[in-house]
């Protein structure tokens, strides 16, 4: 007998618990078969110790005439005597009757009262602390008893999909659960799901007219969007699965990055590209209009090929060259006459003129203007001026000042004077003994380590040869340097 039998009898099982007392009452009168067959035919005694509970308390549906004594004919049909509870399930000793054994159990106080569990309506025992021989026979069960808690039956729907979520919410969200989660307080920053929020990405819900002019409000809206996206992850009362949480977090992160990149693109389109030094990339000439493409007017004394280039070479280089070569213009004295032959002396006479001489000194004392690229310059259209331009280029090749006056001085340089020690170099290269050191010691050229340690004669000879070669080289180098100083300074 165990205590589990009290918890196993519930209100929902009246049909199983009622017929058991009948069997027990049928067995109870046979507690003393060892006293003889006369006591077996007598009814049950009326004492409080062995009196079973009345049938009105345990089984009111069955009348008492149904309690029949066992047959007395064949002793084999009689059931074995029940073991009293006071002796722990062991048979009484041979000199003790079952009544005395029951009295011993009563004196020890081993009779247990009925447990007061939830949902059990058992009457208290009649005999006080008497032996529980009149109690119903315990029913043995293989499975443990499962008592359903009332908190689990709150939901109205019986669908299988809602059941795991309800169990999770009882353990996590509500304070009625058991375990560590019941001891924890409610979270302070509890987010609530928005009901009217559209579950669309920002790229689809955004209008195409929105964009560059209001970048700051869009950034504020993005912050609110990201805050509103947070409840999707895990704010509802039903906790989703971790895979759904990960998927929602990934989608939210992708939406935020897309929104940030779109805002950056809009801001890049709005703001013009600026230089790091706050300077425009292309230096546009501020006063292009007052400078027409015909080359600006220059003093009339200048020759046609020597006008200074304009300040803005980009515009002037692409423009067609216009030379002031008109016959009636002031540049007429620079025009060559078709019947004259200009020699070098005639060009040198221009340098003697007062106005032209002043021009040359002023022109060449200033900065030098490089000639334009011949690929950009169009071919000359005026044929008789080609020889004049070639002569002018030839005049530039002579010198900057006093053209035609300087004399060419030829300086003779002899190679023998520069290469005074060539003979010594040749003799040195021919007679120098080079040290051909091989890395292999087996060929006999290099001494071995054992020869160096023991100072053998072969190592000493090799060392003398090396020093003799070094001595010869130093002597020849000193002699060469002495010859070079004599050839250079004369002493």
From Swiss-Prot:
One Pfam family from the record: PRCC
Compartments, as annotated in UniProt: Nucleus
Domain of life: Eukaryota
PTM sites of type Phosphoserine: 97, 114, 157, 159, 212, 218, 241, 267
Tissue specificity of this protein: Ubiquitous in fetal and adult tissues.
Keyword Nucleus listed: yes
Signal peptide: none
An individual GO BP term: regulation of cell cycle
Modified residues (Phosphothreonine): 239
Main location: nucleus
Region (Disordered): 1-244, 260-313, 432-454
UniProt biased composition (Low complexity): 40-49, 111-120, 230-244
Keyword field: Cell cycle, Chromosomal rearrangement, Nucleus, Phosphoprotein, Proto-oncogene
UniProt feature, compositional bias: Pro residues: 50-96, 287-307
Assembly and interaction partners: Interacts with MAD2L2; the interaction is direct.
Name of the molecule in the record: Proline-rich protein PRCC
Organism field: Homo sapiens (Human)
């Amino acid at each position: 007998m165990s205590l589990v039998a009290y918890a196993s009898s519930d209100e929902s099982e009246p049909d199983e618990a009622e017929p058991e007392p009948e069997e027990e009452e049928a067995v109870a009168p046979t507690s003393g078969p060892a006293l003889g067959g006369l006591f077996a035919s007598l009814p049950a005694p009326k004492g409080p110790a062995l009196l079973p509970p009345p049938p009105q308390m345990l089984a009111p549906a069955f009348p008492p005439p149904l309690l029949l004594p066992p047959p007395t004919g064949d002793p084999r049909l009689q059931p074995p005597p029940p073991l009293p509870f006071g002796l722990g399930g062991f048979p009484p000793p041979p000199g003790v009757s079952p009544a005395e054994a029951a009295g011993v159990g009563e004196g020890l106080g081993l009779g247990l009262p009925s447990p007061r569990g939830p949902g059990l309506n058992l009457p208290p025992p009649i005999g006080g602390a008497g032996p529980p021989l009149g109690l119903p026979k315990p029913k043995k069960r293989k499975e443990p008893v499962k008592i359903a808690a009332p908190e689990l039956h709150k939901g109205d729907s019986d669908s299988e999909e809602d059941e795991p979520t309800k169990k999770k919410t009882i353990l996590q969200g509500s304070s009625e659960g058991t375990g560590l989660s019941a001891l924890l307080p409610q979270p302070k920053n509890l987010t609530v799901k928005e009901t009217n929020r559209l579950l669309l990405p920002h790229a689809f819900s955004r209008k195409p007219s929105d964009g560059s002019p209001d970048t700051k409000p869009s950034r504020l809206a993005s912050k609110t969007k990201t805050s509103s996206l947070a409840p999707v992850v895990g704010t509802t009362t039903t906790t989703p699965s971790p895979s759904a949480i990960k998927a929602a977090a990934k989608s939210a992160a992708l939406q935020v990055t897309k929104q940030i990149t779109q805002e950056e693109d809009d801001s890049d389109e709005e703001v013009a590209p600026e230089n790091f030094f706050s300077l425009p990339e292309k230096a546009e000439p501020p006063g292009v209009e007052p400078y027409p493409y015909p080359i600006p007017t220059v003093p009339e004394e200048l020759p046609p090929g020597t006008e200074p280039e304009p300040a803005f070479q980009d515009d002037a280089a692409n423009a067609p060259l216009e030379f002031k070569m008109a016959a009636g213009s002031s540049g007429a004295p620079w025009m060559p006459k078709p019947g004259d032959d200009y020699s070098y002396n005639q060009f040198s006479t221009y340098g003697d003129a007062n106005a032209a001489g002043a021009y040359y000194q002023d022109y060449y004392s200033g900065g030098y203007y490089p000639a334009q690229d011949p690929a950009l310059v169009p071919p000359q259209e005026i044929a008789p001026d080609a020889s004049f331009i070639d002569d002018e280029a030839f005049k530039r090749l002579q010198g900057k000042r006093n053209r035609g006056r300087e004399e060419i001085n030829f300086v003779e340089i002899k190679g023998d004077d520069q290469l005074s020690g060539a003979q010594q170099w040749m003799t040195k290269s021919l007679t120098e003994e080079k040290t051909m050191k091989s890395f292999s010691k087996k060929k006999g050229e290099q001494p071995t380590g054992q020869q160096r340690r023991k100072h053998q004669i072969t190592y000493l000879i090799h060392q003398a040869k090396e020093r003799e070669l070094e001595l010869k080289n130093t002597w020849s180098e000193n002699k060469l340097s002495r010859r070079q100083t004599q050839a250079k300074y004369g002493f």
